[in-house]
From Swiss-Prot:
Residues 8-18 have a biased composition (Basic and acidic residues). The active site is at 201 (proton acceptor). Residues 1-67 are annotated as: Disordered. Disulfide bonds: none annotated. ATP binds at residues 88-96, 108. This is Serine/threonine-protein kinase-transforming protein mil. It catalyses: L-seryl-[protein] + ATP = O-phospho-L-seryl-[protein] + ADP + H(+); L-threonyl-[protein] + ATP = O-phospho-L-threonyl-[protein] + ADP + H(+). GO terms for molecular function: ATP binding; protein serine kinase activity; protein serine/threonine kinase activity. SUPFAM superfamilies: Protein kinase-like (PK-like) (SSF56112). It comes from the Viruses.
Length: 380
């Protein structure tokens, strides 16, 4: 796990910078200056903190020393600065509002009442990881709030969720577009897993389509919130919507059933939605029966419903992601390779048609306005 940066390092850097700042400093390049123009701290820095001076000068100028505080404090947003407007919807772990904070934002107020000190610290530790996520296919994390309720602030999206496109508006995508949505989603998930973040609630409601079909994944991480607490003891419980939950997560036999492979299973259900236009188990209208059947391995999504023009390699990928034994599922690097091969084998006219959405938003800081759930949540 990534260690939070100690704010003392930043304060030393600011202090040293102000001491050494002079008119000649801009023209010269003294030995103690870093390439960005920041003085290096004179005190030795522990190994895990060596990367602290690596952020750009502009960002550092925004940081004001506030005593001996953990650096995650600099990402805390005062509740009084945020203006909440429309209530967008409720999910498994909280309620989402559209808000204003230096522009449009989405504010997710979490369903954690009176957090214990352990819970609060765990939340802060996770925020330290979430704030380091920057990827074109990931919804941008902007900060957190702790007054009254724990809350997460992210970029706002104007479009619709994949769930809404597929199951409410019934948008007619072409096969190459469906495959590209699958690729971008896998790309975002691969990035999260490389950061050691397990999503735990991957589903079409948490995938947002922005502009030229650019995928944004939201509501990731936050294991603290997506678990039940009993005193100081953390007890995992099934989270998210059951249609997307892996059999081992439904069974809850392990103390922590969440893994990269449980995310892959959920992604497999998203692939199923993309390649059928339907939700799985539509013939079973009893939630408890789905939990029982899937958990025991008696039911699995009906792959005969996949579109007739769904490429064979995609059919294989859907089946592999939905394997009942989690160790048999591929991980995202392998999934991405499969999709890349698949896209390469598509007719060239289709491949070129999808290129604008592949390359338009190549900057990792892509913070264009983007969708949060303006969608009805599924029944299950």
């Amino acid at each position: 796990p990534t260690m939070p940066v100690d704010s003392r390092i930043i304060e030393d850097a600011i202090r040293n910078h102000s001491e050494s700042a002079s008119p000649s400093a801009s023209s010269g390049s003294p030995n103690n200056m870093s390439p960005t123009g920041w003085s290096q701290p004179k005190t030795p820095v522990p190994a895990q903190r060596e990367r602290a001076p690596g952020t750009n000068t502009q960002e550092k100028n925004k940081i004001r020393p506030r005593g001996q505080r953990d650096s995650s404090y600099y990402w805390e947003i005062e509740a009084s600065e945020v203006l909440l407007s429309t209530r967008i919807g409720s999910g498994s772990f909280g309620t989402v509002y559209k808000g204003k904070w230096h522009g449009d934002v989405a504010v997710k107020i979490l369903k954690v009442v009176d957090p214990t000190p352990e819970q609060f610290q765990a939340f802060r530790n996770e925020v330290a990881v979430l704030r380091k996520t920057r990827h074109v296919n990931i919804l941008l994390f902007m900060g957190y709030m702790t007054k009254d309720n724990l809350a997460i602030v992210t970029q706002w999206c104007e479009g619709s969720s994949l769930y809404k496109h597929l199951h409410v508006q019934e948008t007619k995508f072409q096969m190459f577009q469906l495959i590209d949505i699958a690729r971008q989603t896998a790309q975002g998930m691969d990035y999260l897993h490389a950061k050691n973040i397990i999503h735990r609630d991957m589903k079409s409601n948490n995938i947002f389509l922005h502009g030229g079909l650019t995928v944004k994944i939201g509501d990731f991480g936050l294991a603290t919130v997506k678990s039940r607490w009993s005193g100081s003891q953390q007890v995992e419980q099934p989270t998210g919507s059951i249609l997307w939950m892996a059999p081992e997560v439904i069974r809850m036999q392990d103390s922590n059933p969440f893994s990269f492979q449980s995310d892959v299973y959920s992604y497999g259900i998203v692939l199923y939605e993309l390649m059928t236009g339907e939700l799985p188990y539509s013939h079973i209208n009893n939630r408890d029966q789905i939990i029982f059947m899937v958990g025991r391995g008696y039911a699995s999504p009906d792959l005969s419903k996949l579109y007739k023009n769904c490429p064979k390699a995609m059919k294989r990928l859907v089946a592999d992601c939905l394997k009942k034994v989690r160790e048999e599922r591929p991980l995202f690097p392998q999934i991405l390779s499969s999709i890349a091969l698949l896209q390469h084998s598509l007719p060239k006219i289709n491949r070129s048609a999808s290129e604008p959405s592949l390359h338009r938003a190549s900057h990792t800081e892509d913070i264009n306005s983007c969708t949060l759930t303006s969608t009805r949540l599924p029944v299950f």
